[in-house]
Amino acid sequence: MTRSLSIVIPAYDEEKRLPGTLERITGYLQSGEWTFSEVIVVDDGSCDGTVRVAEEFRADAPAVRILRNPGNRGKGYSVRHGMMEAKGEWTLFSDADLSSPIEELEKLWKAAQESRAQVAFGSRALDRSLIGVHQPLLRESAGKLFNVAVRVFTGMPFLDTQCGFKLFETKAAREIFRRQQLERFGFDVEVLFIARKLGYSSIEVPVRWNDMAGTKVGTVSGLSAFLDPLRVRMHQLKGKYR
């Protein structure tokens, strides 16, 4: 079976973490069975040396591509940018901190193939024994409350929409992401909602996960995110996902 893969890494001020992340991902890809693979780093207007270290790594790893946003647009914008440029038949987006180890991709791939799903996404909620390092209690509790809002406003049954480890059939991803409206925290909810609306099959998969220091989600943006499930519902009512 042909296995063609793109990996999108949204990056904002990831100068310190990015080299190790790229080393681990490219090493994994070289040892795997992918007939074609590429890694797309999407810089979101970083103020540090993110682009420089990505370019330095690319000098010895031509499979790495670098895209740059017009300023700081948000994680959702970055992921969409990468998804629309992906060349593989399947595209994974992964957080730059590899809070879900890249090796967990095999679980998503297997689940997608067995269920014939176009979307397979990592979940911390289906098997919490797979969480090595938990978030602080307040953040973890807020995440559970956020999921309640997601289920109430969108009607989706998923227990964790926010894990930054999602695999898409690229053909489906282009249809999903071109309809995306949210550019920051809540985009995960939105793209899963759009996928269901368009009739694509999505499967939630338990994956290993560790909380990593240096989160880019601040208190204000985190509170604002609680409105995103409502925004998704409003966009749906206005016909923006047609």
What kind of region is each of these model predictions?
Residues 14-30:
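Short, well-formed alpha-helical segments that are part of the catalytic scaffolds
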Residues 69-85, 90, 102-185, 211-220, ...:
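Acceptor/aglycone-binding surface of glycosyltransferases and processive sugar-polymer synthases
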Residues 156-157, 179-183, 192-209:
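Catalytic donor-sugar/metal-binding loop of nucleotide-sugar-dependent glycosyltransferases
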Residues 37-40, 51-85:
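Conserved donor nucleotide-binding strand/loop of the catalytic core
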Residues 14-17, 46, 75, 101:
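Donor nucleotide-sugar binding loop of glycosyltransferases
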Residues 43-52, 98:
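A conserved acidic beta->alpha catalytic loop
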Residues 4-6, 38, 190:
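Cell-envelope/extracellular polymer assembly enzymes that use nucleotide-activated donors
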